[in-house]
């Protein structure tokens, strides 16, 4: 399954090097950041799930960049709100 997925995913991405970078980034999101898979996991490991998502054009570097920026913005907004609440409590 994984070998066919790699070959098919390379056709989507263009070359193996970009595929490796994209798949490892997505697999890390799935494994450690609690991201929800966009395909049925079927008891596959995060790397295979990432390859399947790439193969089906469900995830791209651009999409992951946008998601990362949104999450960073939300985190910063929450931190600023917490600081403002603390400052108001002291003032």
From Swiss-Prot:
Coiled coil: none annotated. It is an enzyme of class 2 (transferase). Its EC number is 2.7.7.6. InterPro entries: DNA-dir_RNA_pol_omega, Pol_omega/Rpo6/RPB6, RPB6/omega-like_sf. One of its GO terms (cellular component) is DNA-directed RNA polymerase complex. Keywords: DNA-directed RNA polymerase, Nucleotidyltransferase, Transcription, Transferase. One of its GO terms (biological process) is DNA-templated transcription. It comes from the Bacteria. It catalyses: RNA(n) + a ribonucleoside 5'-triphosphate = RNA(n+1) + diphosphate. Pfam families: RNA_pol_Rpb6. GO terms for molecular function: DNA binding; DNA-directed RNA polymerase activity. Disulfide bonds: none annotated. The RNAP catalytic core consists of 2 alpha, 1 beta, 1 beta' and 1 omega subunit. When a sigma factor is associated with the core the holoenzyme is formed, which can initiate transcription. Promotes RNA polymerase assembly. Latches the N- and C-terminal regions of the beta' subunit thereby facilitating its interaction with the beta and alpha subunits. Belongs to the RNA polymerase subunit omega family. PANTHER family: DNA-DIRECTED RNA POLYMERASE SUBUNIT OMEGA. This is DNA-directed RNA polymerase subunit omega. The gene is rpoZ.
